[in-house]
Design a protein with these regions (language model features):
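Patatin-like phospholipase
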Residues: 1-374
């Protein structure tokens, strides 16, 4: 399974990492990513990439889409509209329709593997993860509000409707029932901007009607971010900041914290084979070969337990991301890049460098992290 974070134009970081995975997979199986992964999930920009991969596109196809259309997707709204949002949705809609088709929906014949997009239903004030699983309760073709009939482009647009940046997306399920028309915004404002743990639940929880078997030999989840950097917080250096400045910084802080929490969920329920250190207490949560009397530093540096030793976790898990802090960018080979500029969701002027940052981060990807999965 493959889970892709949200992050606006920073989806190019994701693609830089995916490019490496695609090469490794092709070398082992000869197929595309949709042939290797059975289920691909995405939130916001991750939903664009996940939908493209599920349709059979390559990373080269999607890199071309982002590099050629990225600036048009962030087309400034008219002056009066900017009271509500910064960018008009029309160019993005047109680009999504061009790539996915106006009438392509979630029916199984249209996708090469299972697909999941995370959205936020404003009408019901709840996260709405919508999948192409044909056995799911709300994917029954007999229902007038069957999810499988939603146009793929519109579902992706709903998942990318970031508040402040873009207007919401209105989706009509049943034209004869007004109560089946809902307003959606970006899935990144739910707890699932990193959809990896949600993907695990939707694949294994019986209520979602897939019921895949758990276990290190049965499930592998690869989770990919769009780049991240720790923040000191809205009031860390200026505890008496005004309320407007404080509130403005809260969404980013909350999203980062929730993203890390979902990552920790996966590393504790699953078996982490690779991931960055999370903090000084739990480090990377990769199971290691420890012996009595080791110092903390020695424990952190100890070799990992071989994957041939089954530890009874629910799945194997690898998390790849790029550290966009000053120190992280320097380590990746980009000391001249301004960290604040590349962290912005709409940093379309940094399209080339974001892709290169992703490619540099991809050097960490190894097939050893994938265990026994071919």
């Amino acid at each position: 399974m493959l889970a892709l974070d949200g992050g606006g134009i920073r989806g190019l970081v994701t693609l830089g990492i995916l490019e490496k995975i695609e090469k490794l997979v092709k070398g082992k199986t000869g197929g595309k990513l949709c042939d290797y992964f059975d289920y691909i999930a995405g939130t916001s920009t991750g939903a664009i990439i996940a939908a493209g991969l599920s349709r059979g596109l390559t990373t080269a196809d999607l890199i071309e889409f982002y590099t050629s259309s990225g600036k048009q997707m962030f087309d400034p709204a008219w002056l009066l509209e900017r009271i509500k949002y910064l960018y008009t949705a029309d160019p993005l809609k047109a680009q999504l329709q061009d790539v996915f088709g106006r009438d392509t929906n979630l029916e199984p014949d249209n996708l090469k593997c299972l697909f999941l997009a995370v959205t936020k239903n404003v009408t019901t004030d709840s996260p709405w993860p919508i999948s192409s699983n044909p056995d799911a309760k709300y994917n029954d073709p007999a229902r007038k509000d069957c999810n499988l009939r939603i146009p793929l482009w519109q579902l992706v647009r709903a998942s990318t409707a970031a508040p402040v940046y873009f207007p919401p997306e209105v989706v009509q399920w049943d034209p004869t029932d007004q109560s089946k028309t809902f307003v959606f915004v970006d899935g990144g404002v739910t707890p699932y901007n990193n959809p990896a743990f949600l993907l695990y639940k939707m694949a294994t929880e019986p209520a979602y009607r897939l019921n895949w078997k758990k276990g290190e030999d049965n499930l592998l989840i690869i989770s990919i971010g769009t780049g991240a950097a720790e923040s000191l917080g809205a009031t860390a250096t200026r505890p008496n900041k005004n309320i407007v400045s404080t509130v403005a910084g809260l969404p980013g802080e909350l999203m980062y914290g929730i993203q890390v929490d979902q990552d920790v969920n996966c590393r504790t329920i699953g078996r982490c084979t690779f991931g960055a250190h999370l903090d000084r207490e739990i480090t990377d949560l990769v199971p290691r070969q420890l012996r009595e009397g080791m110092t903390l530093e020695e424990q952190y540096a100890a070799p990992s337990v071989p994957l041939s030793t089954n530890l009874g976790r629910h799945f194997l898990y690898a998390r790849y991301n790029a550290d966009l802090s000053d120190a992280g960018l320097k380590t990746l080979g980009f000391p001249q890049v301004d960290t604040a500029s590349v962290q912005k969701m709409d940093a379309v002027g940094n399209i080339p460098i974001l892709l290169e940052i992703g490619r540099a981060a991809a050097q960490a990807v190894k097939t050893d992290h994938f265990g026994s999965f071919p």
